[in-house]
């Protein structure tokens, strides 16, 4: 959110317009997509831990600061997950615990939608981190990158 606002302030261009322009450019890179996933219960636990950490690191103060500087809750940028959930709290319409619970729920729902989108739209190597460790994921990745021609092998070894 802050990055998008800074970009608009510096360039006068919407961040979404910039992203659309970049998306149209042909990449000079030979790339492959590696997608990490895990069992839903483990993913949801990590989401909850991450949100708890974000709260400890000042998420509430960040949102309050934006609102205090006059950023309207109606702005698209303020409708993002992690911001919109706290507006009712600052308006006195819910408790902080209720706002955090709503943030966790919305984040879990978003993660589920992301996984669905990736499964339908993106071709690549899926690695289930619930079934392997870091070394196993690395081995799978290296094999895949070689198969895709992204990683060249030295035939002398």
Tell what function each PLM region has.
Residues 24-157:
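Catalytic core of IPPT-family isopentenyl/dimethylallyl transferases
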